[in-house]
Amino acid sequence: IEAKDKKTSEYHFLEAIIRLFFPGKEVDFICMNGIGNLFNETNLNQISLAQESGEQVIVLADADTIAKRQGYAQRKAEIENDMVTHAVSFPYFLYPNNQDDGDVETLMESAARRDLHTVFFDCFEDYEKCVSGTKDESGNPIYNVPDLKSKLNTYMRAQKLPRKLRDRFGSGDWLFDNADYWNLNVATLLPLKEFLAMWLK
């Protein structure tokens, strides 16, 4: 996965999905610390060793957006070219749905229980509009608008939870297995689940 390590929301999100929908599957996550490291020597060696021993290797990464100088089409082309260059092949899934621009946080946001926490999302989005609309004399924004990961982190930190549960946030565990905050049955997760169903051994 694209995450830096297992103390990330991406890792815990995927782990919750696999535990819930693929309970019999044994999965080992390798964190590549950014898509730019996918084809480095260490990761290529791990991929080769895993494939030689008969293990299935799949890659999950953000498609990202044009604003980040990427996007689905460009990310896909880069991965395809790099697979040819390095003579390696593996199935891969680009968040959010293997066809559109976006990232894993796009999927997480779609699974957030907006229906149960409407007030939080309405207030936060009003805040985003207010902050992004504040400009200096030159018309440039004065403030940075929080990114989607920050919004989702704030969503969970705003919940009234016992300390024992709140302590899990520090390791990226945003309680994805808790239906009071996340709905892992939303339609937007179907492409990812179908991909996992096809490739997890």
Model-inferred region functions:
Residues 6-8, 64-68:
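Short acidic, S/G/P-rich loop/turn micro-motifs used as interaction or catalytic elements
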Residues 1-58:
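RecA-like P-loop NTPase motor core
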Residues 6-13, 17, 44-51, 149-201:
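Nucleic-acid enzyme cleavage-core boundary/entry regions
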Residues 66-161:
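Activity-critical C-terminal alpha-helical subdomain
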Residues 17-22, 79-84, 112, 196-200:
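Hydrophobic, Leu/Ile/Phe/Ala-enriched alpha-helical segments that form helix-helix packing faces
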Residues 59-61, 94:
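Structural beta-sheet core signal
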Residues 20-24, 89, 162:
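Short coil/loop linkers at secondary-structure junctions
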Residues 35-41, 97-104, 174:
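A short acidic, often aromatic-flanked loop/helix-cap motif at beta-alpha or helix-coil junctions
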